């Protein structure tokens, strides 16, 4: 399997398919690059080069006991980009991966980034603070941490079968395969990485990163996202990025890249080609 060694020696797994213009994908917590299957296949079949890595401690990347913070996540992405010699890249991030994209573009992307896409992304800041009163109370994330410690396997089943894909909504078209694949990805990763990653995605303030992004940016968000509520994420982020456009998807969930892949893929392709 292909790996790149990050600056601190951590082995980062990546996929690299196709030979056209590069599109790089950044997955969400606590998943892996496999979460992008629908997008990778869709774009590689249309002549694009697609790259997706597993975040440290996630998927097939090394389960190291350190560096589970957004600065390391962005630096690891930069190591993949440098290793492959990528330029003119469109970076696509979902959820926590959207935060990774924001920090990567702001700190490492000069001269290499063509466009950015943030899907159901956590920026600018998830947790409630004095300066972010509309954020989610820290007790929400304390509950996540407790669930990871107590019974991570059951917690991941509950997330996937409930709010992540909107399977808890009346009339939802529930897919056991989607649920099991989410659980499989989560349980492949490191419990420590996932535990510490909760702080990374919930308490990192991306305001300055968003302001530093100077490439065309598409922000995509479902208005029934129960994991990253749209009001304090996408609707704020679009006001901070200089050249951003927000597309809202009525009734769609946090997991729309999987359960509404046709819709997401069509809009993603349109933005890439614009």
UniProtKB/Swiss-Prot annotation:
Start and end residues of each AB hydrolase-1 domain: 22-254
Disulfide feature: none
Entry GO MF terms: peroxidase activity
Keywords: Oxidoreductase, Peroxidase
Domain of life assignment: Bacteria
Active site, UniProt feature: 95, 225, 254
The EC number(s) this enzyme carries: 1.11.1.-
Family membership: Belongs to the AB hydrolase superfamily. Bacterial non-heme haloperoxidase / perhydrolase family.
UniProt protein name: Non-heme haloperoxidase
Protein source organism: Rhodococcus erythropolis
Gene: thcF
